[in-house]
Curated annotation (Swiss-Prot):
Cysteine disulfide partners in this protein: 272-282, 281-340, 309-372, 313-374
Subcellular localization(s) per the UniProt record: Secreted
Name of this chain's protein: Growth/differentiation factor 8
Signal peptide stretch: 1-23
SMART domains according to UniProt: TGFB
UniProt-annotated glycosylation sites, renumbered to this chain: 71
Keyword vocabulary terms for this entry: Cleavage on pair of basic residues, Cytokine, Disulfide bond, Glycoprotein, Growth factor, Secreted, Signal
GO molecular function, one term: growth factor activity
Propeptide: 24-266
Gene from which this protein is expressed: MSTN
Pfam family, one: TGFb_propeptide
Major site of localization recorded for this protein: secreted
Family, per entry: Belongs to the TGF-beta family.
Function of the molecule: Acts specifically as a negative regulator of skeletal muscle growth.
Length: 375
């Protein structure tokens, strides 16, 4: 017993006699290790960001059913982009992205993009339709997306040349049909009288929903339309084949479709910034810049907040499924650890040119990370 007491005293004396400098030196590797850990975390986050951006590029093309990015230059876009109210409203009032995480819901989106608005420019017909010896405007080809969705609106937009004095213009929209026995080759869609003030040109929309629905039911009946807009002197003011200085004034169709809303569920997670020292699974900010990719075919948004997930996942931290922890407890060696992944994602609206030089306004699902968690 006395020997044991002696050993205890000697041990305590050695602890008290330890050089304090030695203790300080011993703590230095710990500080260095912490700094190295922070640097490694920054590097890993940067790699995660780069991977996320590349994945986004692939996802956008895939969800839009594009094999590759449309090769449309800025000069071509300037010529094709209609100068009309509906498109300008989409650009000016464009809801780039709502980063509202207060609702805590998760949309069960389909994988592919949901189309909301399609702007179709006139194109060459598969067959030559002539009236009075010359080709007439306009023929429209329709995306397959329109045929499988409910059409809620279809507007034909036309542009009238400017006048020098107050003028009354008589507008006729005619639908071309196969020649009848009496020689008739068209039927009326709409007639209207417009009073135009002098100055800039004038844009006018005409409801063609019924005509479009008939074309979709019977594609062979789509032979095109003719646009007439004469003033009192018989001068045609309709811009059907734009001349010099009339780029973007082509007639076009604005078609809006609707889709069934998706169900949602609740979820929660952590938010961090780039200077955060949080080691747990967290959502970090990430802005995707399409102009930096050279993707001029995307009209809007030019950039959006995509965000990404990064961090460690312990088996008891923010697990998406409760049984994950139970499986690990039952077989800790045979089960992989949970990963930090998105648990809530939301769509973005996008205005873009497709491969056929049509302007599409649609919703691309699961492009914004709203919540991160371990699962």
């Amino acid at each position: 017993m006395q020997k044991l007491a002696v050993y205890v005293y000697i041990y305590l004396f050695m602890l008290i006699s330890v050089d304090p400098v030695a203790l300080d030196d011993g703590s230095q590797p710990t500080e260095n290790a912490e700094k190295d850990g922070l640097c490694n975390a920054c590097t890993w986050r940067q790699n995660t960001k780069s991977s996320r951006i590349e994945a986004i590029k692939i996802q956008i093309l895939s969800k839009l059913r594009l094999e590759q990015a449309p090769n449309i230059s800025r000069d071509v876009i300037k010529q094709l982009l209609p100068k009309a109210p509906p498109l300008q409203e989409l650009i000016d009032q464009y809801d780039v992205q709502r980063d509202d995480s207060s609702d805590g819901s998760l949309e069960d989106d389909d994988y592919h993009a949901t189309t909301e608005t399609i702007i179709t420019m006139p194109t060459e017909s598969d067959f030559l339709v002539q009236m009075e010896g010359k080709p007439k405007c306009c023929f429209f080809k329709f995306s397959s997306k329109i045929q499988y969705n409910k059409v809620v609106k279809a507007q034909l937009w036309i542009y009238l040349r400017q006048v020098q004095k107050p003028t009354t213009v008589f507008v006729q929209i005619l639908r071309l049909i196969k020649p009848m026995k009496d020689g008739t080759r068209y039927t009326g869609i709409r007639s209207l009288k417009l009073d135009i003030d002098p100055g800039a040109g004038f844009g006018q929309s005409i409801d063609v929903k019924t005509v479009l629905q008939n074309w979709l039911k019977q594609p062979e009946s789509n032979l095109g339309i003719e646009i007439k807009a004469f003033d009192e002197n018989g001068r045609d003011l309709a811009v059907t084949f734009p001349g010099p200085g009339e780029d973007g004034l082509n007639p076009f169709l604005e078609v809006r479709v609707t889709d069934t809303p998706k169900r949602s569920r609740r979820d929660f997670g952590l938010d961090c910034d780039e200077h955060s020292t949080e080691s747990r699974c967290c959502r970090y900010p990430l802005t995707v810049d399409f102009e930096a990719f050279g993707w001029d075919w995307i009209i809007a948004p030019k950039r959006y907040k995509a965000n990404y997930c990064f961090g460690e996942c312990e088996f008891v931290f923010l697990q998406k499924y409760p049984h994950t922890h139970l499986v690990h407890q039952a077989n800790p060696r045979g089960s992989a650890g949970p990963c930090c992944t998105p648990t809530k994602m939301s769509p973005i609206n996008m205005l873009y040119f497709n491969g056929k030089e049509q302007i599409i306004y649609g919703k691309i699902p699961a492009m914004v990370v709203d919540r991160c968690g371990c699962s």
